[in-house]
Every structure is written in C-alpha cells, then in structure tokens.
Amino acid sequence: MTSINLNLTVAFSLALAGVLIYRSHLMSTLLCLEGMMLSLFVMMALLISHFHMFSTSMAPIILLVFSACEAGVGLALLVKTSNNYGNDYVQNLNLLQC
C-alpha cells in the first residue's frame, strides 16, 4: 500500500471516527461526512487513473454530485433546526418526541 492510499484510508477512518464520536452537534457530523466523501472521491479518482479504467471515469463525478446534494440538504436541515430550537443538537431531530 502506497503512502497516498494509506493517508487517504487514515483520513476516511478519522472522519468515520469523528461521526461516531462527535454526534451530538449536527455541524460537526456534517463536516465529518464531508471529509469522508472527499477522501472517497480522491480514492476513486486515484484508483481509476492507476488501473486505467476509463470506462468508469464518471463515478467520482457522480459521487461528488451526491456529496454536494448531501451537503445542501444537511445545511438546510441545520438552518431549520437552529431556527426552531436555537441550537444544532442532533437529539432535536428525533421525530418520536412530542
């Protein structure tokens, strides 16, 4: 495993650990999800260029599009939650509360 692949794997693992550890605030969860998507994007682009699989060269762009959609929906949810409750706690998103 080259150092670039190792660094990207560590970046993905740290972002995943951040999602699991800092899950009380929505903003920190969204930032960690963006880190995961960015490391996946770079990994996919490097693997496609390394193995010369140019028939799947649109896959990183599609992943980037879904990442942008996820960021937009997440930020809209963050704005709506902070307007309603005054904070960005994930526990406010529980739909089973009365």
From Swiss-Prot:
Any one Gene Ontology molecular-function term assigned to this protein's record: NADH dehydrogenase (ubiquinone) activity
Annotated membrane topology: Multi-pass membrane protein
Primary location: mitochondrion
Subcellular compartments: Mitochondrion inner membrane
Enzyme type, top EC level: translocase
Catalysis: reaction(s): a ubiquinone + NADH + 5 H(+)(in) = a ubiquinol + NAD(+) + 4 H(+)(out)
GO cellular component terms listed in the entry, alphabetical order: mitochondrial inner membrane; respiratory chain complex I
Presence of keyword Ribosomal protein: no
Keyword terms, alphabetized: Electron transport, Membrane, Mitochondrion, Mitochondrion inner membrane, NAD, Respiratory chain, Translocase, Transmembrane, Transmembrane helix, Transport, Ubiquinone
Entries under InterPro entries matching the protein: NADH_UbQ_OxRdtase_chain4L/K, NUOK/Mnh_C1-like
Domain of life: Eukaryota
A GO biological process held by the record: ATP synthesis coupled electron transport
Residue spans crossing the bilayer: 1-21, 28-48, 59-79
Positions in coiled-coil regions: none
E.C. number: 7.1.1.2
PANTHER family, sorted: NADH-UBIQUINONE OXIDOREDUCTASE CHAIN 4L, NADH-UBIQUINONE OXIDOREDUCTASE SUBUNIT ND4L
Family: Belongs to the complex I subunit 4L family.
Subunit text: Core subunit of respiratory chain NADH dehydrogenase (Complex I) which is composed of 45 different subunits.
Stated role: Core subunit of the mitochondrial membrane respiratory chain NADH dehydrogenase (Complex I) which catalyzes electron transfer from NADH through the respiratory chain, using ubiquinone as an electron acceptor. Part of the enzyme membrane arm which is embedded in the lipid bilayer and involved in proton translocation.
Protein name according to UniProt: NADH-ubiquinone oxidoreductase chain 4L
Biological source species: Trichosurus vulpecula
